[in-house]
Every structure is written in C-alpha cells, then in structure tokens.
C-alpha cells in the first residue's frame, strides 16, 4: 500500500526467500513520492535529542549516495541566520554534531558564511547577513522505489501492482491471502509469513484485515509542498526557520522551478485522497516571503503535492504533542502467536535500506 512495500524486497530476495508484493495502487503512488526528496540525517531531529536516529540516517546517507549516484546527488544547504530564531551558537553546535555523529567521506562539512558575499545571499533580503552551509543529499524518491521493485522482480519476486489484499486467514503455520486487482480478478496466495508494510494504512490493515493488535499506533501527519517558478539561479538549497519552530526547505527543482515545503498537520481524512489546502499554501508563501526578495502568492503556485506520514507512537502517547516533536524513526512489531506477521510502523526514505535489513534479520529465524 506504499511507504513503500518494495523498500524491503532488495534485502529479502538476496536471502533467497520467495516473495509476493501486493500494492493496491501503483509503486510510490502515495507517501513515498510525496517526500521533500532528500537523503538526509535530519538536522532538526537533534533538537529532540534523537541522536541515534540522526546517526543511523547519516550512515545511510553515505551508503545510498555511493550506491545510486544516478538518482541521488549531494546538495549544499544554506541556513540564513534569523536573529529572532535559534541563536547562532545553537546552530553551530547542531552542525558540529551533524558533521561528526557518523563517518563522513563524500560530503564537505559545515561552516559559517557571509550572505553579503556568498552566491546564495543574492536572492535573500538584506536583513540576512550571516548564515551557515552544510551538506545533505537529493533523491528521485519515486524512481528509488521503482528501481527496488524492478531489482526484486529480476531476482524472482512477484510484483503485483493495482492489487489489494482484501482478506487474510491465519493458520498455525501459514497465511492464506485473497488479492483483488482493480479489474476484480482475484488471486489466492499462501505464505509462511505476512509483512505489513502498508505505511499510513499499516495500523488499520493490522486491525481490520489481519485482526491483530499492537502496543503501537500511527499518528498520521500531512505534509504538503508547493512548486513555483525558480526564485534563485544557483545550485544551493535553503533551509528556513519558521517562528513556530518548524523547518521549511526551498530546493532547486527540475531546472526551472523551486520546491518549497513541508508542512506538518495532523490528518484525519481519506488517506487515498490527500491534497494541500489554502492555509498550507499561505503558510509556505509567507515563510518564503520572509526570506526571499522575490515575493510569491498562492497564484504563483504552479503545482503542489501532499502526502501522509505515518509517525509511530506508543498506544498511550499524548496526541496533543507537537507533530514536529514526534519521532521519524520506525518500529518493527513481530507477532508469532500463530503464523507470523511483521508490521512496520513509521520510517523515512533515508533509512529504508536499514529498516529492510533489520526486518529481514527479524523474520529470518522463521525460515530457519
């Protein structure tokens, strides 16, 4: 159901397991293609003391940039220092940690800059005279998902797109699954183990279809992006601080455009039909106008997209916690009371490979 089930296939087929992937729509048609398209450690997660997550993501960033340079590339980010936001010493400390939490060979480190003389300072308002530069990576997120699925198929996995898992029956030693395509053709599959990698649908699939339970729950957060005609003509991206504490990126996009996002809003609507609303567009335009000389308005938006992030929480966690403070890490829940089922809660695109590795390590004993 996307976020994305194909992310783990690369590791599964290498261990010679027989795999059927069931995707109710198309590959990467939901959350996986609605990211900010970054391979990054998550600089802002340091404020929440998520050092382990950041370190893991930084290690994965290095691995991914080496393994798929045709769909990923290094990207330098400029953070203008806004005197009304985080103090300079805090930013320096955070960037120092970001540079040193994991071994870094491919990317240059961070440093301070004068925006009066730096190329990236030209498009910014005069009030921003100092800033910081650091490194992360860009990724074609949808293509990454599709490439994983293609590689799995080439090694024997069966990839069934536009095919929903409509029912499962659990026995002591196996599952029986009923799969239905969009043209109403049905397929019956028997499996020794079921992996629930349904992203935003993982909790509902576990409860409604598998009839299982877990001590985890998903908090669904909508993230929206806007695309406007390019606001700058250089290869740097920007990371902006909003007065509400959130971080928003402005990234070169498809040569002629600038991608701006993301928002963080609790979502209770239809996960199959997610779209940006007027307040989100205004939010992103206003933040852009706070930093850039060239003002934009909602009428300048040439495209927008939205996705739902499945953030994992313990069942008794407070839903009133700020969405930005909820972890972007993942949790794996293996139920072996009868035929085993592994449910994946949460996750981010940067750590997809590590998640898959840990998931297959967890289920490997089932196959002796």
Where are the regions that the model predicts?
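A conserved short coil-to-beta-strand element within the FAD-binding core of flavoproteins
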Residues: 161-175
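Glycine-rich FAD pyrophosphate-binding loop
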Residues: 14-33
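Single conserved hydrophobic/aromatic residue that forms the stacking wall/gate
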Residues: 2-13
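Dinucleotide-binding Rossmann-like beta1-alpha1 core, especially the glycine-rich loop
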Residues: 37-120
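Short linear elements at protein peripheries
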Residues: 98-150, 158
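C-terminal catalytic lobe of FAD-dependent flavoproteins
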Residues: 135, 141-144, 151, 210-224, ...
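Core beta-strand elements of the Rossmann-like FAD/NAD(P) dinucleotide-binding domain
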Residues: 184-193
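Flavin (primarily FAD) binding-site architecture
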Residues: 196-211
């Amino acid at each position: 159901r996307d976020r994305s089930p194909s992310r783990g296939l690369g590791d599964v087929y290498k261990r010679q397991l027989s795999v059927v992937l069931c995707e109710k729509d198309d590959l990467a048609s939901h959350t996986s293609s609605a990211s900010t398209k970054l391979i990054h450690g998550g600089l802002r997660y340091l404020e929440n003391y998520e050092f382990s997550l950041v370190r893991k993501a930084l290690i994965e960033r290095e691995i991914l940039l080496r393994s798929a340079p045709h769909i990923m590339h290094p990207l330098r980010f400029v953070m203008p220092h806004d005197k009304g936001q985080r103090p300079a010493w805090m930013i320096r400390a955070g960037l120092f940690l970001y540079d040193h939490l994991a071994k870094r060979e491919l990317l240059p480190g961070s440093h301070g800059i004068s925006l009066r003389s730096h190329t990236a300072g030209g498009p910014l308002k005069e009030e921003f005279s100092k800033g910081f530069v650091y490194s992360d990576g860009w990724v074609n997120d949808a293509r990454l998902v599709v490439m994983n699925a293609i590689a799995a198929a080439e090694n024997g996995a069966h990839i069934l797109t536009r095919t929903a898992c409509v029912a499962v029956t659990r026995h002591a030693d196996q599952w029986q699954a009923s799969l239905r395509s969009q043209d109403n053709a049905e397929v019956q599959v028997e499996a020794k183990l079921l992996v629930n990698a349904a992203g935003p649908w993982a909790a509902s699939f576990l409860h409604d279809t598998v009839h299982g339970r877990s001590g985890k729950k998903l908090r669904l957060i909508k993230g929206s992006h806007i695309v406007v005609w390019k606001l700058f003509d250089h290869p740097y991206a920007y990371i902006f601080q909003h007065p509400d504490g959130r971080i928003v990126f402005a990234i070169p996009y498809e040569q002629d455009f600038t991608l701006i996002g993301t928002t963080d809003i609790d979502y209770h609507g239809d996960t199959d039909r997610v779209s940006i609303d007027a307040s989100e567009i205004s939010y992103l335009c206003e933040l852009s106008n706070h930093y850039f000389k060239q003002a934009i308005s909602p009428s300048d938006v040439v495209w927008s997209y939205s996705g739902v992030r499945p953030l994992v929480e313990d069942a008794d966690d407070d839903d009133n916690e700020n969405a930005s403070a909820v972890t972007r890490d993942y949790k794996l829940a293996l139920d072996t009371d009868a035929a085993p089922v592994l449910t994946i809660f949460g996750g981010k695109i940067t750590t997809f490979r590590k998640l898959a590795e840990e998931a297959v390590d967890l289920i490997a004993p089932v196959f002796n």
